[in-house]
Amino acid sequence: MLIERLHEIDVKAGVAVRPDARRIVTDASAEYLRDMSPLFEAVTSSQLEGAPTTWSDAKCMIRTGRKPRDLGERMILNNYKAMQRIVEIKDHPLTVDLIKELHHTLTEDTLDKPDAAGRYRREDEYVRVADDETVFHVPPHASRMAVEMEALCSFANDDGKDGTYMPDIVRAIVLHFWLSYEHPFCDGNGRVARALMYWSLLRSGYSVFEFVSISSILKKAPSKYVRAFTYVETDEGDLTYFLLHQTKAILRALDEFKDYIGRKARKIQDAESLLKGSRFSLRERTILVQALRNPGYPIRISDCETWCAVSYATARSDMIKLQNHGLVEMRKEGNAFVYYPVSNLIDILEECRKK
């Protein structure tokens, strides 16, 4: 079963037949996905840890650049920054310093002990994984953390050239389990473990995972996530349970991503068809097509100058007309004014077509 799932992941992720999995999203808002997908993973990963913040509040915080209003929003902002950092370092070898940096990014201003961000737990700091009734895991003694984390980094960076081949998906999942098991930090270990799995997947060429949220699947059945972990411990370290659980979650995440892209592409195509017979000018249609392809992404007047090959004054006039039609909203960001497509842009265009 595991071998079949690994092959299925390769096919669905595009690695087996398309080395550049970004092609999957070329025609469906790649820029928007590049910004919003890390946020979706940040939200669901944080919600797994108890953050109550909603998707709409988190999206508003990231888009406007406002400061977090509570602990939940701080966790999400930290996760978002960590996901962006993972993309930056995907081609770098994993080091202890990078693990500590990720932990600091993920937990900054969220811990009961502020000084615990970015450092291993000390021998006098008791850590366990439990709910109100049951202790699921008591991590190994803190004295072994330095050695174990060095070993984990060596494992993560192993390219198999010495003959010790391991499927890349398996390696990423083992990294996830290993860090979770060792629990090297006072808190935030689950977030770091999932971050390392993403780093490993991206480093191995599974670039589609820059856009796929695995935590969104784990959040739907957190008890199964915990159960898969505890089964490994109670069965003499047999990782099969966790590998099967995680490969199933990855496949479901890929399926949901594919469905989302399909829905998005069809909706955009339908809306673009509406524009062809609309009362908007050619320049306005050009701008609206870009807005449809990149929902939630800022439109600057300089962008319109480029798309339509017009002067600044003409581009500004076009954007004001679209604003007056209720199709875009103007916001001030720093010293500049930018425009954002309204969230119900497609619905408004459909209504315009009926009139």
Residue ranges and their predicted role:
Residues 1-355:
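FIC/Doc superfamily catalytic core
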